[in-house]
Amino acid sequence: MSQILSLRVPDQMIQRLDRFARRLGNGMTRTKAGVMLLEESLRETEFAGIEYRDSPVGRQPYMKGSGLAIWEVILIARQYDMDAERMARDYPYPVENIKAAIYFYDAYREEIDQAIEDNHLGYEAMKRLLPNLRLFEVPKEEMREEANP
């Protein structure tokens, strides 16, 4: 369910909102763009270690102080059984920001799980998107040699 909210905003802000909506494309309207930005702003207020940014796949939440989208943080955190302190020992990010990413995931699990799933395209799907894509294997021996110079 939704409600109508009437706001009086400066003309310059309307122009900026229209420009933002055009940049997003896909039939984005001023109203949809405004609602999206309001939702993002509320989420950033509720989760201090999170910020929304433009990315090649659209706007998505990132962990502040990093180049990692929340779905990427969660993929890593799963390797640490979602233990922010353990993860912080191996990664150069404040434990508070890692915790914020995990809390954000707890609140928006379905959305983040969908982003993780979207990232796991198979080779055939990738080939359709990137026709020049070539698949090759690196022998395990070479991987070990590079890991232990």
State each model region's role.
Residues 1-11:
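Short Lys/Arg-rich basic patches
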Residues 20, 86-89:
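Short alpha-helical "recognition helix" segments of helix-turn-helix
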Residues 27-49, 53:
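Short, basic amphipathic alpha-helical segments that act as recognition/interaction helices
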Residues 60-63, 116-149:
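Intrinsically disordered, low-complexity basic tails/linkers immediately adjacent to helix-turn-helix/homeobox/MYB/SANT
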Residues 11-29:
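Surface-exposed, Lys/Arg-rich phosphate-binding patches that contact polyanionic backbones
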Residues 27-29, 42, 91-100:
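Short, basic interhelical loop/turn and adjoining N-cap
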Residues 48-52, 111-123:
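Short Lys/Arg-enriched helix C-cap and helix-to-coil transition segments
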Residues 66-81:
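Short, amphipathic alpha-helical "recognition" segments used to contact nucleic acids or chromatin
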